Amino acid sequence: MKFYQNLFQNNIKYGQTLFPIYILLLFISTILSLEQDNFPLINISPGLYALQLSIGYPQHDFLLLVDTSSKYTWVRGTNCTFCAFTDNIYDEEASISVIHQDEISYTTMSDIKGSVSGNILYDDIKIGDFYATKIELLVASEDEYQESADGVLSLKYPKDPNDVRNILNKLYLSGFIKKKILYFNFKDEMAGILKIGSIPDYITNDKKNYSTCHINDNNNNWNCLITHILLDDNFNFYLANVIDANAIFSTGLEKIYVPKDNLDLFINNYFKSFPNYDEKSCSVKVISEIHQIYCLRNFLNIKGPSIHFIMNGYAYRISFDDLFEDVYTDSYNSYKLFKIEFYETEKNEWYFGTIFLKQYEVVFDAENKLMGFYGDNKYDFTKYTNEDYEEYCWYNTVSVILLFLVIIIPMIYEVTHKMK
């Protein structure tokens, strides 16, 4: 009995001495749970050719904005009478166009926020050794729903109309490109540059600023799975809201469209975080089943936080300065419109337009079923996942148990022993 008494007394003495060490270990274990590793780059060998297009007779020059989430690809025309655009990118060696078939008709396209109408013509296109006939080209006039719509080039090839990506496959099978890859970046909100078959070397050589996310279905959409949204700049994963949404990327959209179920999330976790927020700061209006948030310009004079969407271990940022646009001024106040709008749907699908894509250079990689984003406007959350949170809890649990065994139990024994 004396042996056990001495043992516990020694434990009390050692426990009191080692208490700061256990606190230090507890702190270190917490820090270890927050470690982040770089996400490895999937190496993709670059192709050989870049692509620029001139279409129609007389020839019209186009910069293409690739939208493979639909069968159409938005383009901006240089000779369009309603287009204020002057760049001429026609390259005779890279692409030529033959006389179109003079088949012109009228059509209407619908999407989640309205419709676009214009004239369709069918053009034959020759790109290197590749030749395709009757490619759809829609020259769309601007309207209240699609202010940036100047033209549309279809990715659908008539011989295989069910596959919207098949032009990429046809180019690959023809030997004109070595990899089934589309790459583009925006020159501004209205235009961009397309390359087919290759990725610029400066992207493939820069592992730090290039990341990818997996395409999560087979419905001919370029989309990724977003798991969380972070509505502040603290970069604390545990403050991120779980959403598990399907992110559909569309260069034909200017804004981001989010299911209406998330409206309260943004109001409560984003707008109400501003120190000067009150009930009059922002209001919600419904236009054609789209819920829009209007805020007083004076309320937004204080710079607010960015918004981060976490996909495949990376947080992609939309900065505060890009989240609002001026809309109107009445007799008393000026208002700004929040560029994330909310629509009625039963699916958890988030549509990302140019407000997101203009932040990055984008690679559509049909070889590996990936989308890649290049730019330094993101943060690595690869190791900072729910599994790490469980490991973090495990570290703390073990530390508490050790603390209890080494200090608390001997102290209890000592107190009860003296009482006897």
Task: Describe the residue ranges of each PLM region.
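Aspartic protease catalytic domain
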Residues: 33, 45, 66, 136-143, ...
